[in-house]
Amino acid sequence: MGRLVVVSNRIAPPDDKKSSAGGLAVGILGALKTAGGLWFGWSGEVGNEDKPLQKVTRGNITWASFNLSEQDHEEYYSQFSNAVLWPAFHYRLDLVKFQRDSWEGYTRVNALLADKLLPLIEEDDILWIHDYHLLPFASELRKRGVNNRIGFFLHIPFPTPEIFTAIPPHEELLEGLCDYDLLGFQTENDRQAFLESVAGKTRLTTHNGKSHQAWGKTFDTEVYPIGIEPDEIAADASGPLPPKLAQLKNELKNVKNIFSVERLDYSKGLPERFQAYERLLEKYPQHHGKIRYTQIAPTSRGEVQAYQDIRHQLETEAGRINGRYGQLGWTPLYYLNQHFERKVLMKVFRYAEVGLVTPLRDGMNLVAKEYVAAQDPKDPGVLVLSQFAGAANELTSALLVNPYDSDDVANALDRALKMPLTERISRHAEMMKVIRENDINHWQETFIRDLKRTTPRSVESNLQKKIATFPKLA
């Protein structure tokens, strides 16, 4: 078997330290180091698009990156990927802004990237493509004669057929996805939603539950819940506190902490979370002066109106809640619209009695797993988790809540704040068992293993040709 070629919208810079890399980068680098190969993606730069591919090699891995023109970046990335696919796949059709030009830009850039990658592909390479920016990428490679094994992993949810078919070019997207040999999803619900969408548009046949045919194409589907590096997170969390954090911990020693961190995005349910916390203060006044909720939400896609709106809404809500319930010497809610280093966050997780993770819809949500892994197993905190996060399928010992029901979340927070040590230890141990079994290495190893087991298109094509030449029985 040849090299591994990874394609994603963005690549992690080759000289980034592991400590600053996110979970996806760690998983991809682990797979690349095992097989050797290439990581291909956008450099993050807009303009100077005629610049040759920028290549850097470290050991047995090569990074190859390209620039995008302003038009391509706007239509492919800002408009179609993030103003059509992202909201639709997160069940927010009210925020979808479809324009025919953006669809044309999306397909044009996928074709452009296929042209750029084509000369770099070797005969025995296997290709692993990532996420919603590149749904039609396999189709573009097939058009150019690439018969290598090509796998795809979707990091975000796949919506139900009723939602997906609202995207105007939904049929083209579905048929294009069937050009992959293996399609990986975060949850079984996502996998089934995809298959139901295909079955609604063409004849779908399934063999052994996971191998399918549609539009004359053969492909496999499977569930691969992405994981984390629990030992690395535990080490980061248990190290010495920086001076400012040590001082803050001392100041808060008589207060129980509820902690959340997510990038500022409408899919994360932040306004609903603030309302649920307010409901906790209203319904359980015994907690006044004894708890503090800290929400860290660094700005994301700040140029998009929907993101500007949610930022203003959160600032208003935080001020209103503090104005209503705050006391001299006690501010019930801290909202920080800024970025913190990942290592620092792991230390903060460890000293938070409650981790509050309540997205309205999420493919997985690694923050939930990171919070659990950062805890002291002898005195762990409690995870309050949305039932609509992919992580809820694995972390069943968390307190699962409906993020749309403020009373449900408030009741869970009250229960978490009062939970006895024995129950906290038991729930934490059960979640850690799952997190260790399905860590980031297990995720990438099982996906690559299954992709290698698929039948290459060239072999499949030759078999079909041979079958076609068999004499027909009279």
UniProtKB/Swiss-Prot annotation:
InterPro entries, sorted: Glyco_trans_20 (IPR001830), Trehalose_OtsA (IPR012766)
Entry EC number(s): 2.4.1.15
Pathway named in the protein's UniProt entry: Glycan biosynthesis; trehalose biosynthesis
Annotated site residues (Involved in alpha anomer selectivity) in this chain: 86, 156
Residues the entry annotates as binding UDP-alpha-D-glucose: 22-23, 263, 268, 340, 366-370
Catalytically driven reaction(s): D-glucose 6-phosphate + UDP-alpha-D-glucose = alpha,alpha-trehalose 6-phosphate + UDP + H(+)
Keyword annotations from UniProtKB, A to Z: Glycosyltransferase, Transferase
Membrane-crossing segments per the record: none
Gene3D superfamilies: Glycogen Phosphorylase B
GO molecular function term, any single one: alpha,alpha-trehalose-phosphate synthase (UDP-forming) activity
Biological processes annotated in GO: trehalose biosynthetic process
Chain sites annotated for binding D-glucose 6-phosphate: 10, 77, 131, 301
Function summary: Probably involved in the osmoprotection via the biosynthesis of trehalose. Catalyzes the transfer of glucose from UDP-alpha-D-glucose (UDP-Glc) to D-glucose 6-phosphate (Glc-6-P) to form trehalose-6-phosphate. Acts with retention of the anomeric configuration of the UDP-sugar donor.
Family affiliation: Belongs to the glycosyltransferase 20 family.
Subunit structure: Homotetramer.
PANTHER family attached to this UniProt entry: BCDNA.GH08860, TREHALOSE-6-PHOSPHATE SYNTHASE
Protein name: Trehalose-6-phosphate synthase
Organism classification: Bacteria, Pseudomonadati, Pseudomonadota, Gammaproteobacteria, Enterobacterales
